[in-house]
């Protein structure tokens, strides 16, 4: 029997977009309508009442019950609604209001927009990072956020990555990070305050890396089973893992593969990962159709190298209908 394979991809984008230059930023810059310097753009644009107004409705629509959900929602929205502009004709940084109209930009445009959304919602412990690479003088910028004591990179797409995951994924894409310039950004009485830089070497990135273990993988499996049982009429049937149990028929199986999960996962965003996985299982059209008549399920979580493998089984309970004989 052919087992359908569902693949849930999280893409990591680290395209460089900043030419090297000598910093000329002060806390009281002369603001222009368009800025090339990222520090000046963040301060000037995000102090502008016009930009705050442009961001307000979107930020409110993306606000979740906590910071983790808000960050997840922002990155998901950016991934689905914006695209990277490989042919941007100028190095002027887009104002958030412009970016929201054009729907395409480069890393600095994403950085300002993401920060603007977070600051409009009054989140603290947010900022940005300038990333240096070994093989190129072109730099990269990304928004960052400190969540529960861990620094996460918010780079245009899901998922948010801790520093260790970020440097590993960047290296896998052929871009070797040598250092990062870390800046924290806050807002006080309408004024943007930028603090930094703090210089992070490659070893600083690597030290801040979460390593998933078997206990956490088991907790993910248990949580997914519980969520499926609560959101459907299905009962958990352990025997479906191996065969079609007595009293059941039509055993079906699906495999959901999440590439690089062992590298990108961090338990601070566990709830968001779980909800995303459940959505891709329960909202798959083929699975939804079979759930209508199924009565039992089983789910198993394993790994293959760095990938997460979720095996999902469904079966229908056989109802025996006997025959009554009339005796005269």
Swiss-Prot record:
Membrane topology term: Single-pass membrane protein
Subcellular location: Membrane
Domain of life the protein comes from: Archaea
Subcellular location, principal: membrane
GO cellular component, as recorded: membrane
Ranges annotated as spanning the membrane: 3-23
Database matches in SUPFAM superfamilies: Cysteine proteinases (SSF54001)
Keywords on record: Membrane, Transmembrane, Transmembrane helix
Cystines in this chain: none
Pfam families: DUF553
UniProt family annotation: Belongs to the UPF0252 family.
Protein name per the record: UPF0252 protein PF0978
Organism from which the protein derives: Pyrococcus furiosus (strain ATCC 43587 / DSM 3638 / JCM 8422 / Vc1)
């Amino acid at each position: 029997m052919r087992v359908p394979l569902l693949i849930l991809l999280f893409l990591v984008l680290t395209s460089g977009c900043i030419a090297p230059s000598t910093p000329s930023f002060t806390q009281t810059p002369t603001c222009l309508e368009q800025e090339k310097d990222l520090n000046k753009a963040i301060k000037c644009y995000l102090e502008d009442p016009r930009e705050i107004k442009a961001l307000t409705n979107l930020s409110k629509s993306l606000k979740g019950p906590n910071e983790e959900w808000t960050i997840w929602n922002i990155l998901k929205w950016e991934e689905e609604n914006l695209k990277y502009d490989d042919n941007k004709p100028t190095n002027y940084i887009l104002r958030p209001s412009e970016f929201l109209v054009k729907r395409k930009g480069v890393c600095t445009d994403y950085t300002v927009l993401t920060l603007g959304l977070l600051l409009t919602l009054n989140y603290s412990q947010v900022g940005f990072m300038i990333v240096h690479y070994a093989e190129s003088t072109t730099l990269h910028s990304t928004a960052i956020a400190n969540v529960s004591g861990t620094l996460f990179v918010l780079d245009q797409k899901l998922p948010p990555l801790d520093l260790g995951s970020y440097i590993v994924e960047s290296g896998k894409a052929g871009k070797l990070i040598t250092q990062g310039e870390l800046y924290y950004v806050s807002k006080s009485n309408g004024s943007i305050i930028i603090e930094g830089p703090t210089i992070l070497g490659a070893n600083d990135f690597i030290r801040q890396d979460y390593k998933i273990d078997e206990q956490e993988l088991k907790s993910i499996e248990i949580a997914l089973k519980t969520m499926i049982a609560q959101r459907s009429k299905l009962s958990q049937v352990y025997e479906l893992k191996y065969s079609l149990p007595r009293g059941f028929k039509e055993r079906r199986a699906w495999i959901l593969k999440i590439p690089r999960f062992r590298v990108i996962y961090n338990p601070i965003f566990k709830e968001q990962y779980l909800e995303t996985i459940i959505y891709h299982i329960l909202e798959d059209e083929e699975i939804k159709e079979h759930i209508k008549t199924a009565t039992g399920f089983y789910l198993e979580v394993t790994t293959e190298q760095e990938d997460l493998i979720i095996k999902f089984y469904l079966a229908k309970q056989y109802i025996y209908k006997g025959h009554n004989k009339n005796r005269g």
